[in-house]
């Protein structure tokens, strides 16, 4: 197994390229977010980022959040969700959410969320978790986490469309404040 540091660095690089800025290596995602692996490797290496097929496969196999997926033929790779690149359609199908979903955040964002709800901002969707632990972990990346509860089933009944990504992240366009329960 590659050193953890190399896997983390490669995962971050793949997130940058496959979710946000494929242009940093002179590439463009197709309409479903795929990149040809051979082109990814060649373009990354010519720009000073050491990348191999073996390393890509190891990152895909070991990433605990299952951020990346390979095409059935193994020739392409894409991010499972989290894109900020406009025009990426992951061909997600509508899903019926559980009664409650969760979102982790920090105190600094609570006033805006109370007023505006959860907004996708630069991403294509708002990301929600099916369990408290995952949402708390997400929130802890920016400080002391605060857990928000989302009345997902009520939202769905009111016409909001939910999707479930390949790596089990719940996605929705926005969460209005009326569907949120805030920490006390």
Curated annotation (Swiss-Prot):
> What biological-process terms (Gene Ontology) are attached?
tRNA processing; tRNA splicing, via endonucleolytic cleavage and ligation
Gene3D superfamilies in the cross-refs: 3.20.170.30, RNA 2'-phosphotransferase, Tpt1/KptA family, N-terminal domain
EC code: 2.7.1.-
> Record's InterPro entries?
Ptrans_KptA/Tpt1 (IPR002745), RNA_2'-PTrans_C (IPR042081), RNA_2'-PTrans_KptA (IPR022928), RNA_2'-PTrans_N (IPR042080)
What molecular functions are annotated in GO for this chain?
NAD+ poly-ADP-ribosyltransferase activity; tRNA 2'-phosphotransferase activity
Identify the Pfam families for this entry: PTS_2-RNA
Transferase found in the keyword field: yes
* Keyword Isomerase among record annotations: no
Q: List the keywords (alphabetical).
A: NAD, Transferase
- Please name the top-level EC class of this enzyme: transferase
Return the HAMAP family for the record. KptA
Family, according to the entry, reads as follows: Belongs to the KptA/TPT1 family.
Biological role stated in the UniProt entry: Removes the 2'-phosphate from RNA via an intermediate in which the phosphate is ADP-ribosylated by NAD followed by a presumed transesterification to release the RNA and generate ADP-ribose 1''-2''-cyclic phosphate (APPR>P). May function as an ADP-ribosylase.
What is the name attached to this protein's record? Probable RNA 2'-phosphotransferase
According to its UniProt entry, this protein's organism is Rhodopirellula baltica (strain DSM 10527 / NCIMB 13988 / SH1)
The gene behind this protein is: kptA
